[in-house]
Every structure is written in C-alpha cells, then in structure tokens.
Amino acid sequence: MEELQGYLEMDGFRQQYFLYPFLFQEYIYALAHGHALNGSILYEPVENLDHDNKSSSLIVKRLITRMHQQNRLIISVNDSNQNRFVGHNNHFDSQMISEGFAVVVEIPFSLRLVSSLEEKEIAKSHNLRSIHSIFPFFEDKLSHLNHVSDILIPHPIHLEILVQTLHSWIQDTPSLHLLRLSLYEYWNSNSLITSKNSISLFSKENQRFFLFLSNSHVYECEFIFIFLRKQPFHLRSKSFGSFLERTHFYAKIEYLVVVLCNDFQKTLGLFKDPFMHYVRYQGKSILASRGAHLLIKKWKSHLVNFWQCHFDLWSQPARIHIKQLYNHPFYFLGYLSSVRLNSSVIRSQMLENSFRIDTAIKKFETVVPIIPLIGSLAKAKFCNVSGHPISKPFRADLSDSEILNRFGRICRNLSHYHSGSSKKQSLYRIKYILRLSCARTLSRKHKSTIRAFLKRLGSEFLEEFFTEEEQALSLIFPTTSSPSHRSHRERIWYLDIIRINDLVSHL
C-alpha cells in the first residue's frame, strides 16, 4: 500500500494518471476484498476449479495471466463475441477487474481531496457526515428563500458515456480500454437485466465499483453548478467557449466566439443569484433560490438542455419540479419540509392612540410523511396498505426476546431518525403499528389471542423498549416537564446518523 501511494504522489502520475500497471498487481485485488490473499478464500465457480480447493491467490494469478494476453483484450464493435476472455467465466473475470479498478482509481481522488483540504485549511468534522446536519442548514437558509426545485438526477446512463466521463479525468488509454471491456462483459453476462447499459447494473454485486461510477456521474451532472458559481460577472468568451465545448455544443462554438463579451455577461447574469443554495443526497437534489419564478425556470431549462447534450439522453423536464416554499412542501431524506408563515398580532399604544401591528414570521417545518411510511411498513410486512398491523413472519426458532429486540430496534431507529419532526402524531402512529404488530407476532407464535397474551404478561411487556427514546430525551433536556410532553414539542437533530433509514429508503 505504501509503495502504491508513493507512486501516486509523484508529479508525473498526477499529470498522466497511468493506472494500467497496477491492475496486474496481486495486492490490488487483496485490497479490493479487504484482506490478504492468504486470508479468507474467494472461490471461482466449481466448473472452473476442477473441484479443487483453490485459494483466491491462484485465481488472481490466473486472471493476471489472461490479462497479459493482449490478443484477447481487443474490442471489436462488429463482433461482440470477440470481447471475451475465451474459455473462462467472463462475468467473474469482469467483476474482479472492476473491483481492482475501483481500488486503483479511488486513491488519486482521495489524495487530491486530502491535499485540497490541507490547502484550504478545512478541518475534518465527523458531525458534518451526519444526514441530520443538512436540516439545520435548511432551517437557517430556506426560511429566507422563495422557490425550490426538486431535482432527480437523470439515469440510466449508457456505459460508453461513463467511460468518456472517466476519460476526462484519467488520461490512461489502456486502463480505459480494459474498463470498457469489463463493463460490456459484465453487461452481456446479465441477460436478466432489462435496462441495458444501465449504471444500476452494478448496484448489488459490486457496490464499491457502483458507488465510484455513480459518484463520477453525479459529479458530471453537478459540473454546471460548479462552473457558474465560480465565474464572475465579466466572463470571457474564451472561458465560456470551453464550457460549451465540454457540453458538446460543437456546432455553436464558432458562432459564439465572435459574440461580444457583453452578451456573455447578460447570459450569465440570468443565472447569477447570491441567495441560491444546492443540497444533494444520492440521486436527489434540492436547488433553492430567493429570486423570481422566472430565474428558477431558466435554471430548469438550462439543466435539461445540459443533461441532454452532455449525456446524449432524453432528460424529462418532469424530473425537475419547481415549488413555492410557502405553498408546497418538498420531500427530502424522509421528511416533508416546508416554510410556514406564522402570523401574529401585536397591539401597541402610544399616549392616547393604540394600533395593531400584523407580523408574519417564517418558520421552517419538517413532518413525517405518514402515508409513504405506512406503504414502506406494508412492504416490510408489518401492516397492510391501510395501516392495520399484522403479524410479521419470523423463523420458528427465534425466541421471544429476539423478536422483541428486532421490533424494538426498528422502532428506536425510526424514532431516532425522525426525531426532527415538528409534529409527532405521525411518528406515534408508526410506533403504535410496530407495537401491535409485535404483539400479534408473539401471540401467533404462542397460538393465542392478543388479549389473552397481553393479559398473561401484562401491558408493561411492550413498554420498556418502546420508551427508551423518551428516556434519552429526559437526559438531554432535564426540565420539569414530562418526557412525553417534551418529546412532543422538541425537534432534535442527531449528528451520528450517517445513512438513511432502511424503511425510509424504500419511499
């Protein structure tokens, strides 16, 4: 690993990104699996091992030997059968190559990130990794804005577009050829996938490689924001021409170069907004602006044109929803967020004259979307589509304590994740569904009715692990009010949540 980092830190590497030799090193594939090659065993399919117990070290050596045979790595457009490792499991080889490529290509980007943080003297903060850290930002900023665009980043992406995207970062032709080969082999071996050449093809079997491809694609989608925010008002025509070239407007460059700089200033002025904020999580992003409705519509039109021309795909305008914050809430990270106007009347009196002052205070609110969450619980077999609790099917060998722990963990996680809700009624209903579903599951296991089961064990049987959240709140807010009343009012954002809740992710 130190040898690899030493080579990557060389100035020549930073200019050329020559990654191809590392794909022929065994330790790269060991890093891909997170252990040494003599550790956990990685087996090929039985038909390729001749029923012998071969370790992953031998498998990697065989793969590297096949990769050295350049005549079998030639990509042919006319005959797809030539794009194969002849006589071997193509799917398995392509998967291993993609895993190794993900390890190699991540290192230069991580080094670039570390150097960028050091240059800007940005201190690392683990609290900023929390998903909940986004909502205090919303509370501070969105109450002063007018419009929000709910954006879904376009997908699926053709495999060739992904290779071209990486080509703009990595000037290493052999590595890109090998990556292209493994991508198409991976796709050809998945005949059950209906969305051909889709980036979602690798989401289950090779998550590390999928995350790298998806992040590179999202970075390209966000390139327009980075460009426009960095440019001043007096933009040169040369800079704007290079931007257009990147978005593949080749036919328009010759005409636009001769346009006066004032026209570019007017064009950029349409998108210049000092009160614009952008937030993204996975494939969904929020673009909020204080400007007029016309400005946000121009952003929508520009984004659609940019994605269509840059990625050669049809980007539906319906994937970008423009909403007014005062009238329409937007869904993000499992919350329905909105800005509500709280009006209040103040009576003032000066000498013998009295008058009233009507004031409106903007308040950012987040609530739990009860209907989508019930639908997610119904998919997980906790209730039906109407929200009526049902018994959850479990293995017969599970003990009562194990079933209780599972239900309790799910309930606590949901309470923990949705602790920032302004109104807790929806969350209490979800707790009720889980509590009654747990009781139905246990009574079904003991072949009894719910009433007889709870009567035998007492109503306090399900109270202990469902009230741990309120007990935790009593430690955070040690006041005289009761924990249940306090939890109904307080909105809490935890800084230890690094991923979205599983049930919320189904929405």
From Swiss-Prot:
Record GO cellular component, one term: chloroplast
GO biological process, one term: tRNA processing
Keyword set includes Zinc: no
Principal place of residence: plastid
Domain of life: Eukaryota
Keyword flag RNA-binding: yes
This protein's UniProt keywords: Chloroplast, mRNA processing, Plastid, RNA-binding, tRNA processing
Cell compartment(s), UniProt: Plastid, Chloroplast
GO molecular function, one term: RNA binding
Protein role: Usually encoded in the trnK tRNA gene intron. Probably assists in splicing its own and other chloroplast group II introns.
Similarity field: Belongs to the intron maturase 2 family. MatK subfamily.
Name of this chain's protein: Maturase K
Organism (species): Persea americana (Avocado)
Lineage: Eukaryota, Viridiplantae, Streptophyta, Embryophyta, Tracheophyta
